[in-house]
C-alpha cells in the first residue's frame, strides 16, 4: 500500500474539494491515461487494487505510472462506541482528486490492450473516469 514516510500532523480536517485539477491533467509520461471526471477521495487500497487489475491484464509488457499519492489521513472510531470523546484514530490514507486529474498512464503496449487494462482499473475506483490518449499519437 502507498503511505507517506513522515507527516507533520497525525490527523487532519476533512475539508472540501472545489474546482477542477490545475496540474496533473495531461498525459505526461505514457501514451494513454485514465482521467477522473468527478470529485472524490481514493484510498491507498483502491489505488493499489486498480493498479493490480491493470497490470494483470497487460502482463509483462509495458510500463505503468501512478500519478497520484495518498498523503491525507482518514480516521475512524472503534465499533460500538458512542459519539464524542474526541476524534478517532488514523486508520488509512487517501488521495483527494478533482475532475481532470490523470490517475494512471501506460506506455509500451498497443492502445487496445492498454484501453482494456485501464477499463478494468476504472471498475475498481469509486469515481467516474474516462480514457484519454496523448495528443500527437
UniProtKB/Swiss-Prot annotation:
NCBIfam families: rplP_bact. It comes from Oleidesulfovibrio alaskensis (strain ATCC BAA-1058 / DSM 17464 / G20). This is Large ribosomal subunit protein uL16. One of its GO terms (biological process) is translation. Keywords: Ribonucleoprotein, Ribosomal protein, RNA-binding, rRNA-binding, tRNA-binding. Part of the 50S ribosomal subunit. InterPro entries: Ribosomal_uL16, Ribosomal_uL16_bact-type, Ribosomal_uL16_CS, Ribosomal_uL16_dom, Ribosomal_uL16_sf. GO terms for cellular component: cytosolic large ribosomal subunit.
